[in-house]
A protein has these predicted regions:
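Post-HExxH zinc-binding segment in Zn-dependent metallohydrolases
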Residues: 24-39, 200-245
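Surface-exposed patches in mature extracellular/periplasmic domains of secreted proteins
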Residues: 50-54, 122-131, 201-205, 224-231, ...
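Bacterial N-terminal signal peptides
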Residues: 6-16
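Positively charged n-region of N-terminal signal peptides that target proteins for export
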Residues: 1-4
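N-terminal mature-domain "stem" immediately C-terminal to a signal peptide or N-terminal signal-anchor/transmembrane
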Residues: 22-81
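Pan-zinc metallopeptidase signature
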Residues: 58, 245-320
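Acidic helix-start/capping segments at beta-turn-to-alpha-helix junctions
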Residues: 55-62, 126-140, 233, 299-302
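Acidic/His-rich structured neighborhood in mature extracellular/periplasmic domains
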Residues: 82-222
Length: 320
């Protein structure tokens, strides 16, 4: 048998190592556990016992990722039990879609191999798909990617009529964008966050951190979310840039991030677009893609001066 040259060289020149990205750790068992608990809760007439069922059958035996998701989004057993009863049409419509988690993450190992080539310092992170109560399709805690399956795997068939406003309108737009078809990009966006430093502070700091994750996830997957912000942005770029410059140093995020369409733009999450364009324009000027991606990921997002310097280096904002 003829050995590949690099393996033959390793045998001759021991010790020799070949650096590759580790296979991703993906946990999906919480989804099946949720639905068995859901069925039990619907059959239980006593309110206190319904909460106990959620605690005993979903929360306590749940994965570390589920527990992290509940911590980050402040989910409680009582909230789960209440939502299970309150939204039967929603749960019936989303149930079959949550079975797509394995298929939706089928490209993950390949995508992370590309990520590792672009960013050799990539650190491993686990990914957990669990069912939440509609407060995130994806978030992180340390080295854990936490996917809210009831959101991330959805599509236009999801029934939101029972949900309260403004959640109903926001999620109608979100599900109509077919997030389940974009799951590879969503996983990568959150994986980028596990490599970045956290931030608190100004709009600029949050928007750039989100935009870098969007840019890198698109670079790897070739996709970005089919959300209105990406259609709206190019048509209103001058307005977005002017308002961003005026508001970027403040800590008010309501017009820009984690919001609904009730804002001056009439489109949610325009801050993602602003941050994405900053990252995109920065990368256009860089001769060394690997080095530039490392600088973006390793930027100190908690330092407003460092973030301001990055924004200025991008050239995206108009001159005063």
């Amino acid at each position: 048998m003829r050995l590949p040259f690099f393996l033959f060289a390793c045998l001759l020149l021991l010790p020799c190592t070949v650096t590759t990205a580790a296979a991703p750790s993906v946990q999906m068992d919480d989804i099946a556990r949720f639905w068995s608990t859901y069925d039990a809760v619907l059959a239980e007439p006593d309110a206190a016992q319904r909460v106990a069922l959620v605690r005993q059958h979903y929360v306590e035996p749940g994965s570390a990722g589920l527990h992290a998701l509940m911590k980050v989004r402040n989910y409680t057993a009582a909230e789960y039990a209440q939502a299970m009863l309150a939204w039967p049409r929603f749960w019936a419509s989303v149930r079959p879609l949550t079975a797509n988690a394995r298929h939706a993450s089928a490209t993950l190992e390949q995508d992370l191999a590309v990520f590792h080539r672009l960013y050799p310092a990539l650190r491993p992170a686990s990914i957990t798909y669990a069912v939440g109560v509609l407060r995130t399709g994806g978030t992180t805690l340390g080295d854990q990617v936490l996917i809210g399956a009831e959101m991330a795997l959805g599509d236009a068939s999801v029934d939101v009529i029972e949900l309260p406003e403004p959640l109903r309108s926001r999620l109608r737009v979100f599900y109509d964008s077919a997030p389940g078809a974009n799951n590879a990009q969503n996983n990568l966006h959150e994986y980028v966050h596990t490599q970045q430093r956290e931030t608190t502070g100004s709009l600029a700091q949050y928007a750039v951190r989100e935009g870098v994750a969007e840019y890198i996830a698109e670079r790897i997957s070739g996709r970005r979310p089919a959300l209105p912000l990406y259609a709206y942005g190019p048509l209103h770029e001058s307005e977005i840039r002017a308002r961003f410059r005026a508001e970027m140093d403040g800590d008010a995020l309501d017009n820009w991030l984690y919001n609904n369409a009730r804002n001056p733009f009439g489109v949610s999450d325009v801050g993602y677009y602003a941050g994405y364009r900053i990252a995109q324009e920065y990368m256009r000027q860089q001769p060394d893609e690997q080095a530039a991606i490392a600088r973006m990921i390793e930027l100190d997002y908690s330092d407003p001066v460092a973030v301001r310097g990055f924004i200025e280096a991008s050239g995206w904002l108009p001159q005063r």
